[in-house]
Amino acid sequence: MGRRRQVSDQQISIAAREVFLDRGPKAPVAMVAKKLGVSTATLFQRTGSKQQLMLMALQPEVTAITELDRGIQLDVPVREQLARILVELNDYLGMLIGGSITLRAAQIEAELPDPTPSKCRALLADWLTAASAAMLLRVADAITTADVLIGTLESRHIHAYMQQVQLSSKQHRDYIRAMLDVVFPAFG
């Protein structure tokens, strides 16, 4: 019978993500091990290499389209639906952007996970088209609107990363609601 794991893969991912996003790709694995209360050897035994640890930690584990997959919900206000969709996309894009920048700085090539930002844009455009067809929302150009909404979220994450600023979930939610009021003034 093998020894019980001291820490889960999820705990390793979270700790490594925090260390590498905060300290950059040159942060030693020993910092992650210390944060977890395990030895560096234990981490290498579990992940194989620093590169594998970084890949494990810096690629999103969740999908960005759970809310989009629900489709249009006639019993939920459209502003609420769109806000939930954008909060979910924002969380996903934040992980993807921070992770991608850090992996690139470490010269680690990694494929973008599915859904890619382009696919997220296309799915959001489809949702906006459906909301417009159901007369829940006025959208002149769903593709451009999706690009504006997602592009704004991406740029906010890039700016926060470059300024080394951590934004809270509440700050993101408040920003998304304010952005919706600007893009769709009829909501306000």
Where are these regions (language model features)?
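Basic, helix-initiating cap at the start of DNA-binding domains
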Residues: 1-35, 41, 51-55, 67
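Amphipathic alpha-helical packing segments from all-alpha helical-bundle domains
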Residues: 95, 109-134, 143-147, 158, ...
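Amphipathic alpha-helical segments used for helix-helix packing
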Residues: 52-58, 90-111, 158-162
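Hydrophobic alpha-helical connector segments
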Residues: 67-95, 145-149, 176
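Amphipathic, non-transmembrane alpha-helical scaffold segments
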Residues: 5, 9, 58, 113-121
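Amphipathic C-terminal alpha-helical segment
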Residues: 91-95, 126, 130, 146-168, ...
